[in-house]
Structure formats: structure tokens, C-alpha cells
Amino acid sequence: MALPLIQIALDNLSLASALNDLAKVGDAVDVIEVGTILLTAEGVNAVKEIAKRYPHKLIVADGKIADTGKVFNQMFFDAGAHFTTVICAAELPTVKDVVTVGNSYTPIKETQVEMTSNFTWEQVTQWKQVGVQQVVWHRSRDAQAAGVNWSDKDLQAVKRLADLGFKVTVTGGITLNDIQLFKDIPIYIFIAGRTIRDASDPLQTVQQFKDEFHKYWK
């Protein structure tokens, strides 16, 4: 299995704060996420600025699109994002629209369906049918705060998604100790936000994640 990528989530309240965090690890991470909080605070300009400063990195605009998919996706992609996100509760026509927009670019740009507990496996089949390539298995920030840990149900769902042919990203308070839980699954990306940003040595933490990946994926 290929090595997973490491993605930093920038859910900062300002672009200045996000750029300060990126200055420490931007060259080391594989993927840079302009998080929903940062997008709300700074708008699409945050995507433009980060894409300009890090042209060789994959950029995700975590818009959690729920409607008006064509407009949002074109806006984020034109600003420099390679990937965007659509929330799993979005209607199927919205999901189809975001895929269509991404397919109009060369090379193709992709939208990840961000999954919460509010989905059905019938929906998953429909996403596959309309051309979705990526999904994000998401343990919510509020669930983390309530002490909810990764469960067998989570792991089984992630494996099922990978078996269906999706490129699967895992997020939700990921720590170094969590990586081993997913060792038998071809994970595409692990997202770490506060685990990296709040570390005493963020660069070392990124390297530790990569070291963990090398233990379990070849």
C-alpha cells in the first residue's frame, strides 16, 4: 500500500495566524487545508494567498459545500485549490455538480465528500455513480471534546469505503497513537490540525507522523 499523505488543517481565525503556522511546517507537509473556520474568517483570499506561497503543495478548500456547488467549486478551484469538500448531507444534484466542475479542469480537480454520522450507504453508492473519487471520514470536533474515541464501527466503515474504491482521508483529532489503528487500510490522507499547530515542535511532529506511516505502509 502507498504511504498516506499528511495534511495540516488551518482552522485559524486569521490569515496571519495561518501563515505563521505554515512557516513552521509548510515545506514538510504534503497537503495544506484552508479550513472552514479560516475560509469563514478570511474568504477565498486565504486560498489564493496560500496557493501562491506554496505552489508545489496540494491545497484543499474545506468549504463543506451544501448547495450552489458549481459556484463554490469554481470559486475555490480558480483561487488555486486542488480539492474542495462537499458535506454528505448535500443533495445528489449538488454532488454531481461539484464533480462536473472539477472534471472541467486540466488536470482534473476533485471534491471530497465529508462524512458525518448523517449518511446512508445508498448515498455512498450514488456518490460513486456520479464520479466522486474521494471521501473524508470525519470524527467531529464536538465528538472529540465529548471524549468519543475511534471505534470498530469507524474502522469498519473506513475499510468499506476503501474497498469500494474511494481514496479515503481520515480526520478528527488524529494523534500519533491513532495511526496504528488504520494500518490495514489504504488511507490516502491523514489530517492533523491542532496536533501539529499546538505542538512544541510542529516540524518534528510532522516527521513523527511520516515515521509512523513508514511503519505500517510500504
From Swiss-Prot:
Signal peptide: none
EC number: 4.1.1.85
Residues binding substrate: D11, R194
Site (Transition state stabilizer): K64, D67
Domain of life: Bacteria
Cofactor remark: Binds 1 Mg(2+) ion per subunit.
Alphabetic keyword roster: Carbohydrate metabolism, Decarboxylase, Lyase, Magnesium, Metal-binding
Protein name: Probable 3-keto-L-gulonate-6-phosphate decarboxylase
Organism for this UniProt entry: Mycoplasma pneumoniae (strain ATCC 29342 / M129 / Subtype 1)
